[in-house]
């Protein structure tokens, strides 16, 4: 049987080393949310577990402070 060859090219990390996960950085938070405003899973985001926890807390803080919507039902 013929097996497909996977590319050995490394993917870039979704968060660069200089970027800080903060609730005030809305442009960064939006990259890890769906169009509806839901938090995307770690498998889709390709974040580490620590980064995912920090991202979740930051998104929830931004929602509480009305910087980001809880739901985005605009279609």
From Swiss-Prot:
Transmembrane segments: none annotated. Keywords: Chloroplast, Plastid, Ribonucleoprotein, Ribosomal protein, RNA-binding, rRNA-binding. GO terms for molecular function: small ribosomal subunit rRNA binding; structural constituent of ribosome. GO terms for cellular component: chloroplast; mitochondrial small ribosomal subunit. It is found in: Plastid, Chloroplast. It comes from the Eukaryota. One of its GO terms (biological process) is translation. Gene3D superfamilies: Ribosomal protein S18. The keyword Plastid applies. Belongs to the bacterial ribosomal protein bS18 family. NCBIfam families: S18. Part of the 30S ribosomal subunit. HAMAP family: Ribosomal_bS18. This is Small ribosomal subunit protein bS18c.
């Amino acid at each position: 049987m013929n097996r497909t060859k996977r590319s050995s090219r490394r993917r870039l990390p979704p968060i660069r080393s200089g970027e800080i996960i903060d609730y005030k950085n809305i442009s960064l938070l939006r990259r890890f949310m769906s169009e509806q405003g839901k938090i995307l899973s770690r498998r889709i985001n390709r974040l580490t577990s620590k980064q995912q926890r920090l991202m979740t807390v930051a998104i929830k803080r931004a929602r509480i402070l009305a910087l980001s919507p809880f739901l985005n039902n605009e279609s």
